[in-house]
């Protein structure tokens, strides 16, 4: 009997060889840790950043709307218009002097500055500054009156939340508006009562 045939019969099915790439490739690891709190913290941080940006924008808008800031911004155009007005007036006086002495140069002088236009711009800047200063004075007077007749701080932000735990803190803006409306209505009622009483007295006489 051939021994090679026994060896062939006893040998099993050929085994598959595993490539070294398959042996060395690591299996993907699943992420661990609670995923819930992280998005909540990110949302909270984003909300805080948005609130800070809104507050900065409101502060910048308030600074732009401030009357004193507008007056300061008009100082540059006022100086420039004043300089142009004086220069154009000097040029006009020089031209008139030459015309009176019959020495007018018929040659072209290029662009001749208009005195009336520069003077109008100068007066426009002065009017704007005067308007802003008067408005600032009226705001200060109203602030003094409100502090005298309604002693108490008012929140600077119109939609600022009111802290209920601090009753001595500043009153919210809507409450302040309602209080002002009540005061105005009371003053109007007193005025109407005095007028009706004066009319009744005059009719009785």
UniProtKB/Swiss-Prot annotation:
It is found in: Nucleus. Residues 1-65 are annotated as: Disordered. GO terms for biological process: genital disc sexually dimorphic development; imaginal disc-derived female genitalia morphogenesis; regulation of transcription by RNA polymerase II; sex determination. GO terms for cellular component: mediator complex. The keyword Nucleus applies. GO terms for molecular function: DNA-binding transcription factor binding; transcription coregulator activity. Keywords: Activator, Nucleus, Transcription, Transcription regulation. Disulfide bonds: none annotated. Residues 28-38 have a biased composition (Pro residues). Pfam families: Med29. Residues 1-27, 39-61 have a biased composition (Low complexity). The keyword Electron transport does not apply. InterPro entries: Mediator_Med29_met. Belongs to the Mediator complex subunit 29 family. Component of the Mediator complex, a coactivator involved in the regulated transcription of nearly all RNA polymerase II-dependent genes. Mediator functions as a bridge to convey information from gene-specific regulatory proteins to the basal RNA polymerase II transcription machinery. Mediator is recruited to promoters by direct interactions with regulatory proteins and serves as a scaffold for the assembly of a functional preinitiation complex with RNA polymerase II and the general transcription factors. Component of the Mediator complex. This is Mediator of RNA polymerase II transcription subunit 29. The lineage of its organism: Eukaryota, Metazoa, Ecdysozoa, Arthropoda, Hexapoda.
């Amino acid at each position: 009997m051939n021994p090679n045939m026994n060896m062939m019969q006893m040998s099993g099915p050929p085994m598959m060889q595993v490539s070294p790439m398959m042996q060395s490739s690591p299996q993907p690891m699943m992420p661990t840790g609670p995923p819930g709190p992280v998005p909540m913290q990110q949302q909270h941080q984003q909300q805080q950043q948005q609130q800070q940006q809104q507050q900065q924008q409101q502060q910048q808008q308030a600074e732009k709307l401030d009357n004193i800031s507008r007056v300061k911004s008009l100082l540059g155009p006022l100086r420039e218009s004043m300089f142009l007005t004086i220069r154009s007036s000097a040029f006009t006086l020089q031209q008139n002097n030459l015309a009176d002495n019959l020495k007018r140069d018929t040659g072209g002088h290029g662009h001749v500055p208009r005195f009336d236009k520069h003077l109008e711009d100068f007066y426009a800047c002065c009017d704007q500054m005067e308007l802003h200063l008067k408005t600032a004075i009226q705001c200060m007077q109203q602030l003094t009156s409100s502090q005298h007749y309604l002693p108490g701080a008012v929140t600077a932000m119109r939609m600022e939340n009111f802290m209920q735990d601090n009753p001595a803190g500043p009153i919210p803006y809507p409450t302040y508006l309602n209080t002002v409306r009540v005061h105005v209505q009371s003053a109007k009622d007193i005025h109407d009562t005095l007028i009706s009483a004066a009319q009744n007295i005059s009719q009785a006489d």
